[in-house]
């Protein structure tokens, strides 16, 4: 009987399998950062253990780091302690670290792929829920807890119960102006935030195959937002072209051998999934969230829903609470919602393709006078490339802020936060209460919607903008 892509990758990494117990998986790449690693290293120290495979471990500073004045001491004492602790632990245990000021520093899920460390067929873990990003390369990648971080550091293995498999087939092609972010937000609204629970999801179909690697990473990044254990996409020529020539990619004969193996990483024709979902990309439009979880979303052309329309009492109560927290009334057109801050960045949409798309829309225009635009590249390499292309000048001339690399406003763990009651249009992945700062109100959007919103000051798409030079 045939196997799915996920089953092939999983089976290749089983070190031990005992009936009634979780499989013991070998881990090919372990990514760590300053927030979820300190206790794990303490555990190693207390037990007198070393890091078993420091060569398969990569650390970077991203969650707590400032995106301004990164060359100065970190002001927040908690953030400074976590960053300093990571540096000491990396030095003591021989782990490769890319700290602030290093040309390879950045968000861990941006750095791994851009270095070529993320490759098809791998198992990849990190103490971060958006590790699923790396599944875009045909890898099984998922977030783990701090105790599991310690286990991987000590043994390079991890006990895991084998999840079920699901196929999400996206037929057709995305219309112009509709992005991978709109696709995945549409999917989450369709399934709910628990629709993928217990599954490794394979995204497939014509619309997925047409996506760039950056777009595929956006889709896989948000797998956890609808409850999936992991999300992955079969590698193809787009994947190989992205990896080839990167610093950690195979070279010469090793490259040829790697590609030959990677081409086998596809779901067999006679394989079966435990569940299948089919969507039509051609019907999709720009999509935005209105509530306080990623599943509470509607097309940009829609309105805030009436909580009374929900048949399920728990959904109705959740909608009522979301409207209250977000300061919205049912029936309000999404395009009428005023935004205070626009954030373009994060491990979801902070890559060079995202910045190019934003700059193309913003060029020759001015940010709305009552709106702040914050553009944060996902890594130093992305920042330098954007500057080489003059993208930073476009953002600054429009009245936006051009920052250093880091997680920034995706989460309220660094200086880039919303104030209570402040409303954002954000290209990040979570819109929970307080996610971007206590009392902050977050609308998840695509890069084109974010850029257009910065210009108009209300939730908008590029189609809503006047032509450059028309005023």
From Swiss-Prot:
UniProt xrefs under InterPro entries: 3-IsopropMal_deHydase_lsu, Acnase/IPM_dHydase_lsu_aba_1/3, Acoase/IPM_deHydtase_lsu_aba, Aconitase_4Fe-4S_BS, Aconitase_4Fe-4S_dom, IPM_dehydratase_rel_enz, IPMI_cat
Manner of cofactor binding, per the entry note: Binds 1 [4Fe-4S] cluster per subunit.
GO molecular function, one term: metal ion binding
Catalyzed chemical reaction(s): (2R,3S)-3-isopropylmalate = (2S)-2-isopropylmalate
One GO-annotated biological process of the protein: L-leucine biosynthetic process
Highest taxon in the source lineage: Bacteria
Cofactor: [4Fe-4S] cluster
SUPFAM superfamilies (UniProt xref): Aconitase iron-sulfur domain
Gene3D superfamilies: Aconitase, domain 3 (3.30.499.10)
Record's keyword terms, sorted: 4Fe-4S, Amino-acid biosynthesis, Branched-chain amino acid biosynthesis, Iron, Iron-sulfur, Leucine biosynthesis, Lyase, Metal-binding
Enzyme Commission identifier(s): 4.2.1.33
Pathway: Amino-acid biosynthesis; L-leucine biosynthesis; L-leucine from 3-methyl-2-oxobutanoate: step 2/4
Residues annotated for [4Fe-4S] cluster binding in this entry: 347, 407, 410
Pfam families for the chain: Aconitase
Region feature Disordered, mapped onto this chain: 417-443
Its job: Catalyzes the isomerization between 2-isopropylmalate and 3-isopropylmalate, via the formation of 2-isopropylmaleate.
Family to which the UniProt record says this protein belongs: Belongs to the aconitase/IPM isomerase family. LeuC type 1 subfamily.
Name of this protein: 3-isopropylmalate dehydratase large subunit
